[in-house]
């Protein structure tokens, strides 16, 4: 099932009003067909991490393919009293006709490098800004957070259980998609399972136990219905004195006589490290060594790391609010900035300056490469002018923007261009990967390319974004021009 089957709303008006007023201004100026290039990039990894994960591209493709203004949209814009009738007629026939390049969904990404480039008539490029940023900012944030949690779990299963704490239904469903890209094994959100084919998982709520006269009746009835799929929630009254002993009793009296086994128990409160060790001992003593222990309750990468460090016996984690809201750093910060304007047959680079050095943009049309050592590790990313070429194994001079006086040379390296054609003249020109392929791509990069030092949570190694000498000089010339 595609995303469009989940969401049938018209989203042409999912744009900031100033995009519309600027578009109207370009139209009235007779500049509607001026070709420009915009870049999508972000400035800082969430949680001071070593990298982020790019997600949300499939939804952007669907949006571009379906983008048009309905009669109702036009009527609403007319009611604002801001726009001329010729402009509204232009919008009535609006379709995206430009070019888009993007890094593959699931790519490991770093600050200040272009993730998406849009080259199109100025109005088209302007009107799609808000939607592109909405998708990139949300899904990249959640995918990145999910991957931190998955890495903390060290191979133990992680389930997304955050829908009820998400900021709305879109955040719940698309958040589940992004979390799956980031590496979680399953989701508790049935709609996300239907929409994207994500494996779904569920146990029981405290209300099931409270509905019956006691834990024994609740567990017994559940076991009679679900057999070896049963996972009992054991902390409704007292985990060690009541919940686990009752779960063991039902396993012995109901499941084992039927040739079935208790799949697991879930702890949703208390000291997870302490309780999981005690629960494991009780289960093992009862001959239920194969019964899994699941933990939930406000978990994230830090609490999971702590549980494991203390010798906790948790086999799987259900992670909710701190995943689906990216609780510890709830912003991604991607922006959309003008990079070049076409004048005649050439693109003139544009730069945004700032008193804050971190907000000075990288101007012009550019290429982005990932640079690999002879052993296949990613050692840096490289921005060049779009007219420059690199060759595997050949020397290539570069510099770091932080140390521009030190010109260095890549030697015996291979280069992979990251920005790939997505749309040409408004038409999709590439086959999109499946969700499973995106998820596997994330895992493969982390296993084979990204240094472990970049993956640590505390003080991760910095992955450098270098520039060719020619590109850096062009940027400096532009900055001096605007002094």
What are these regions (language model features)?
Residues 2-34, 38, 47-49, 299-483:
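Gly/Ser/Thr/Ala-enriched C-terminal appendages of enzymes
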Residues 2-34, 44-46, 82-83, 88-97, ...:
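Buried, small/hydrophobic-residue-enriched core segments of structured protein domains
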Residues 16, 56, 69-73, 83-85, ...:
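Alpha-helix initiation/capping motif
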Residues 36-92:
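N-terminal, Lys/Arg-enriched amphipathic/low-complexity engagement segments
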Residues 56-59, 141, 434-438:
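Short amphipathic alpha-helical segments
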Residues 75-76, 144-148, 162, 454-461:
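Short coil/turn segments at secondary-structure boundaries
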Residues 202, 294, 315-318:
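Short hydrophobic alpha-helical runs that function as membrane-insertion/retention elements
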Residues 288, 292:
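Active-site neighborhood of glycoside hydrolase catalytic domains
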